[in-house]
Amino acid sequence: VNLNSAIVIYPNPSDGILNISGVEKVDAIRAFSISGQLIKEAVNTNRLDLSSQRSGLYMIEIEHEGATSVNKLIIR
């Protein structure tokens, strides 16, 4: 399964609450600043709360069944 085509991150742009659909539960979700610093990580969930983060562009890494997907997220 191509993870990039299977998952959808929404809403994007976001107010900080990130949801993932397309797979049951992802193994891990990691949010990185655009400079590569790990901001937050969650495991065995399809939701990540980034509402405490500043507005801007973030990279979201999703791990599921050995595959990894990286997506851009804009927080308003």
Predicted regions and their residues:
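C-terminal outer-membrane/trafficking sorting elements
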Residues: 1-76
